[in-house]
Amino acid sequence: MWYDPSSNVVVYNSPDPLALAAALPEARQLTNGYVGVPASLPNLATLANLGLTIPRVMDHRYDWPIHPSKRPLAHQKTMANFMATHPRSWNLSDMGTMKTLSALWAADYVMSQYPRGTCRCLIVAPLSTLQR
C-alpha cells in the first residue's frame, strides 16, 4: 500500500482486485493487480473494515496547530488519525494523555471533509479540562 497525497489516492497491490473494486465503487483497477482508491473518509473506513492497512491521511492533509504549547505529540497524532478514520471510535486512554486535544483535532479534520452542518461530533470531557 502506498499513499499519494497530491492526488489523495491510496494504491493497493491486491491479490483479488475485483473483490476490492466490488467493495468500493470508486476504486479503479490499475495494471498488474494494483487498485487505486480515493482516500475519502468513507472509503478509508471501508478499507479498515476489510482489514487493510490505511494511510495516516491527517499527516498529509491536515494543518496541525503551530503554537508551541499546542503542538501535537506523536501519540496524539496517532490517536487523531485513528479517530478520524474509524467512525464511532472511543479514546479511553489514561488521564493526562491529552485525549481532548486529539479528539478535537480529529473532529476538526473530519468536519472539514464534509459540507458545513452535515457532520456532528460528541466529545465528552470533564469541566476541569475545558477550563484550562
Would you name each region that the model predicts?
Residues 53-94, 101:
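Conserved pre-motif I regulatory segment
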Residues 25, 115-116:
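Residue-level recognition of short, structured coil/turn motifs
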Residues 100-105, 117-132:
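Conserved Walker A/P-loop ATP-binding site and its immediately adjacent core
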